[in-house]
Amino acid sequence: EISQDRAQAVLQEIFKPQHIRNVAFLGEGNGDIKTFDFTFESDAGSSFAQIARKGGMLVDYVTAPEQTQNASATEAHVTCQRAAIDFASQAGFCDMQVVWSSSEGGECVVNLVPMQDGAILYPDIVKVKIRESDRMPIGLNSSHYAMNHRTRHILPPRVPQSVARGIVSLDNVSQGRLALIPLRESAE
């Protein structure tokens, strides 16, 4: 386990590009993932973050909205994805791929997953929220990653891609990807 001081140092390092200040320790979270909980101010606004006591991973981060959003949704979509990847990398989640994103109310939610041996690892998802107007990270949840991420032995697909294309109910399937998906909370 890391100390509260080490957790605060991790927080300071992750949010250094956002000019973090006024960090306050709130207490310890005792959920499924044991955390040190903090509030702070930054260029993004008033924020809350949880750092895992085991390993020092950023588990949860959220910023209260402070301004009206008015970015072009099309332009924001692509740049928000890039901002999400960059922030995830800054927080220690490297080599992540965008698997889904959406935009509403001036905020983008971007779902990122790691890849291993050409397979998308959906159980290890990290969700990042980006403010569209300035591409500022305002949220992150890595609880699934924290609980599931490990090196896996990826088996060959049970169903060949050509067979899978014939099974799906979509008329025009342009490509297929190998994916590891969660199955009933306890299997993949």
Annotated model-derived regions:
Residues 1-188:
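Long, terminal "pre-/pro-" and other extracytoplasmic accessory regions
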